[in-house]
Amino acid sequence: AAELDESSGSSGTPYTWVRGEEELHEIHLTMAILARHLIDDGSGTSRPVVTLNGFSMGAWATGTNVTAALKRLGVVKSTGPDADKMLSAMALLGTEPVFVIAGYPPFLRRLLDAAREQQFDLSRYTMYGVVGGEGMSEALRNRLERTFASVYSAYGASDLDIGVAAETALSIEVRRLAAAHPELAVALFGTTTRLPMVFQYDPSDYYVETIDHELVVTVTRPALVSPRIRYNVHDAGGTLEYADVITACRALGLDPIAAAFARHPFRPFELPFLYVHGRADSTISFMGANIYPEDVEQALGECADSDVLGAFALALIEIDGRDGTCDAVRPCVHIEVLDPSRVGDGELSARLAGVVRDRLLGNSADFRSAVAEDLAAADIRVALHLEGAGPFVGNATRIKRRYIV
């Protein structure tokens, strides 16, 4: 028996991969064991587990395989990315189960917004988030964890496996320490400009190389119908040995193991780390400085207006000079506004532009240098749009968000 999976097609035409029954069994079992571990709060109590799968369903690998894997935890309902349907399922099933909510990171945010609009009291429920498909800022995680007990991300690709690596309590704390201590970020990732997602992986299943700052993965499990040998999905990142990460932290007086234990009361996995900045080409460049979606997401997620903001996308736009001709380009952040009355709010646009600019000045040496050489580099533009309008047309049917337009 075999299964045909499609990639999302986010970079062009979807590609079809063949997976055999034994291969799928190994993937699903590993995912289920890890998920069970991550939702174990150490209390020793046993409650039924219900997984609500908000990933896109169909021929794509993630949605169908999450359903197949997490059936091993208990009941699964595959709603797809439909917040209303998911809330209806929660109302029907009540507050006794532990809910595992799976989906892309923006969907979990949308679920909270829908609950607020419907006055649906999520505080009565115990929920864990399992996300993947794209990066997640710590600002978004912090926001989600006001409601969720914990939110963990997984790294993978339809072209490889959907569970190549996963966040653990330890990897999350390492990432947070790197965000708070630039010297640690430099020691681990070589830069403070772009905070990567940080995962741990099993080297007995995946041999990961770094070539030209991109991850190259070989799946080493023997039960493969479609071999993946030195496969490059063009994700920028690298790998780190467990001992090297702990040593780098302790050299700065930091103890990620203690912090991880406070988050999840179990001994950390002594597995190597894998860090991912995102797709290698996911950036816009302006006056020699790269502007990354991760920095913009962090800035918008931390700002006071985050409740009314939806998706965003980066672009370079032409601006008119005094004679009506285009005489320059500027970086522009297109932002969805969930409140239609705020779309024309000039004060909101200016405030958001300042938030993004301040984040870049504080986090990007390239951007600071560009501004020091020419103040025009600090001229960040913001364009506000109705939900689903402008560059966000089609977002409702797109599997993954598009961050560069």
Language-model features and meaning:
Residues 40, 44-48:
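Short helix-loop-beta connector
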